[in-house]
Amino acid sequence: MSRAGNRGNTQARWLGTGLLGLFLLPMYLSLEVSVGKATTIYAINGSSILLPCTFSSCYGFENLYFKWSYNNSETSRILIDGIVKNDKSDPKVRVKDDDRITLEGSTKEKTNNISILLSDLEFSDTGRYTCFVRNPKEKDLNNSATIFLQVVDKLEKVDNTVTLIILAVVGGVIGLLVCILLLKKLITFILKKTREKKKECLVSSSGNDNTENGLPGSKAEEKPPTKV
């Protein structure tokens, strides 16, 4: 009985965990924040850089709060924050820490874009930039995404020689395989036709031999019609 009871308790715990996961999963999937595919971006000192950020919500949003924050090993601060009333209005900035920052995004037409433009870059701007979003309509559910900005003196040219060599080799191998397959099919087709011709020749030769030897079914066996 003890084993059966333990088995029942284990199944109940697993069932409870599964139900809890199914309950929490929509919450984690409903509000998403993205800063693009690249986790690190590079920009030249003195130039401008667009820090991308978009959000999405399955349940819509009202009075959505957003902010951009900056931090490195020495300091941390909020760069800009604001409110988006709904999907028909643009973001309204409340606080802006630096005049070099401009909100470039728009939330109209379901773009949900709260990207910022950082101008006149300095080497001290190197660090992590986090885009944070909180949606009161989803019981203040929040999410964030971080991108690392590296300010450099000049951008290094990427040497694609190795990549081009690899692509050329792979392309050559694929081309060779295709040629081999086509040649194999051609040889198979020629051999098949050759066998068919040989077979026809043998059948024809066999029929001629039967005719010459007067075998049954040959023309030599035929008799002229009897005259009455």
UniProtKB/Swiss-Prot annotation:
The keyword Nucleotide-binding does not apply. GO terms for cellular component: intercalated disc; plasma membrane; voltage-gated sodium channel complex. Glycans are attached at N45, N71, N113, N142. Residues 203-213 have a biased composition (Polar residues). Pfam families: V-set. Gene3D superfamilies: Immunoglobulins. It is found in: Cell membrane. InterPro entries: Ig-like_dom, Ig-like_dom_sf, Ig-like_fold, Ig_sub, Ig_V-set, Myelin_P0-rel. Residues 219-228 have a biased composition (Basic and acidic residues). It is a single-pass type I membrane protein. Residues 183-228 are cytoplasmic. Residues 31-148 form the Ig-like C2-type domain. The chain crosses the membrane at residues 162-182. Contains an interchain disulfide bond with SCN2A. Residues 1-30 form the signal peptide. Keywords: Cell membrane, Disulfide bond, Glycoprotein, Immunoglobulin domain, Ion transport, Membrane, Signal, Sodium, Sodium transport, Transmembrane, Transmembrane helix, Transport. A voltage-gated sodium (Nav) channel consists of an ion-conducting pore-forming alpha subunit functional on its own that is regulated by one or more beta subunits. The beta subunit SCN4B is disulfide-linked to the pore-forming alpha subunit. Interacts with SCN1A; regulatory subunit of SCN1A/Nav1.1. Interacts with SCN2A; regulatory subunit of SCN2A/Nav1.2. Belongs to the sodium channel auxiliary subunit SCN4B (TC 8.A.17) family. Regulatory subunit of multiple voltage-gated sodium (Nav) channels directly mediating the depolarization of excitable membranes. Navs, also called VGSCs (voltage-gated sodium channels) or VDSCs (voltage-dependent sodium channels), operate by switching between closed and open conformations depending on the voltage difference across the membrane. In the open conformation they allow Na(+) ions to selectively pass through the pore, along their electrochemical gradient. This is Sodium channel regulatory subunit beta-4. It comes from Mus musculus. The lineage of its organism: Eukaryota, Metazoa, Chordata, Craniata, Vertebrata.
